[in-house]
């Protein structure tokens, strides 16, 4: 590497120094920008630093709770976390795996879902295991699934007091492209894969999981996502820009999207339309990502797959659409009875076979055909 140029001599002290005088700039009319050399010697870059680095990513899920986070009275249970999830980017050089940077991130948890006209609790997990990043998407868009509550996609209409105006408008910032969208400024898409006998990677479908930016900064250190691995927006831009600077890629341009959804809320219908996606940078060599299982906490060792009704403050319990009530016991729902205002009890029981009605069947989420925009956030 070429040796740095000798540092320029520092300027002589000036009494009553005025920076505008020294640079011959009129503070009232500065005119075109001026440049001034500064005495700075850039540190020598490490040997492994080049234009096409052998990069890998590891996402540690940290402490993971699968248990339902509310008790029989609808009060939040304590689920302490000592190890927060984090993302680490590595490079491998001469057989040594070198960590380059580590950032806080999120994993999935219990979130609200709109199922059969009712808002439920549903565990939205972050699957562990190997995946790959095949593309980086700038200014991505989020296509909300039918399970997204309509109110989450609406904003108060500032003109709602005017005649003929609806009380809400579609929140276009939530879908994007926008710094405040569900996917933030940039996203990397997670794909499952299989390695063939000759070492090639066979890339499979998009599971809807992303590593992406987010404007909800406090969620990254304290709360859960819908399954995606959120990063602070500025961190996501730094990370993905580094990947593109050190991984050969090609520009595929803007995604074409034809997405629409009609939403009913408080007797009004609102139409959401998305006609264009983000700008795609396709990586010539996918980046391998290992999502670690983390440390499972509590008594439930696997994700609860069925939805759980929201706590009904009036009835005083978790009430199913058919009027039956249930309690959450570990990874199961058990029937219970709720007292009536007159002190009696309602016959709130599950079906005779004791089964919990399947509520996911009507809202299947695509896996192999999810496309590059996915369903989670």
Regions found by a protein language model. Name each.
Residues 1-377:
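N-terminal pre-domains immediately preceding structured catalytic cores
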């Amino acid at each position: 590497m070429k040796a740095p140029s000798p540092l320029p001599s520092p300027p002589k002290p000036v009494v009553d120094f005025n920076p505008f005088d020294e640079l011959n700039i009129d503070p009232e009319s500065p005119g075109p920008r001026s440049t001034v050399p500064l005495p700075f010697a850039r540190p020598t870059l490490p040997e492994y630093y080049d234009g096409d680095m052998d990069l890998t990513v590891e996402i540690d899920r940290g402490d993971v709770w699968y248990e339902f986070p509310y008790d029989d009275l609808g009060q939040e249970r304590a689920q302490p976390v000592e190890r927060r999830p984090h993302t680490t980017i590595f490079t491998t050089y001469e057989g040594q795996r070198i960590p380059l940077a580590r950032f806080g991130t999120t994993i999935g948890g219990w979130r609200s879902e709109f199922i059969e006209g009712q808002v439920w609790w549903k565990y939205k997990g972050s699957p562990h295991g190997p995946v790959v990043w095949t593309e980086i998407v700038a200014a991505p868009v989020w296509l909300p699934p039918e399970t997204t509550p309509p109110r989450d996609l609406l904003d108060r209409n500032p003109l709602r007091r005017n005649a003929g105006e609806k009380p809400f408008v579609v929140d276009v910032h939530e879908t994007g492209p926008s710094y405040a969208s569900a996917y933030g400024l940039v996203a990397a898409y997670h794909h499952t894969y299989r390695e063939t006998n000759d070492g090639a990677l066979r890339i499979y479908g998009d599971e809807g999981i992303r590593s992406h930016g987010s404007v909800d900064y406090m969620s990254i250190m304290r709360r859960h996502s819908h399954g995606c691995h959120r990063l602070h927006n500025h961190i996501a831009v730094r990370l993905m820009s580094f990947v593109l600077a050190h991984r050969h890629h090609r520009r595929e341009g803007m995604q074409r999207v034809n997405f629409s959804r009609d939403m009913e809320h408080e007797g009004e219908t609102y139409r959401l339309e998305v006609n264009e996606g983000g700008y795609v940078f396709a990586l010539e060599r996918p980046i391998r990502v290992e999502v670690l299982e983390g440390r499972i906490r509590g008594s439930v060792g696997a994700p609860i797959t069925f939805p759980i009704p929201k706590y009904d403050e009036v009835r005083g319990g978790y009430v199913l659409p058919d009027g039956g009530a249930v309690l959450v016991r570990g990874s199961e729902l058990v029937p219970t009875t709720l007292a009536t205002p007159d002190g009696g009890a309602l016959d709130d029981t599950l079906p005779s076979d004791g089964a919990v009605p399947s509520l996911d069947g009507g809202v299947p989420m695509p896996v192999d055909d999810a496309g590059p925009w996915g369903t989670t956030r």
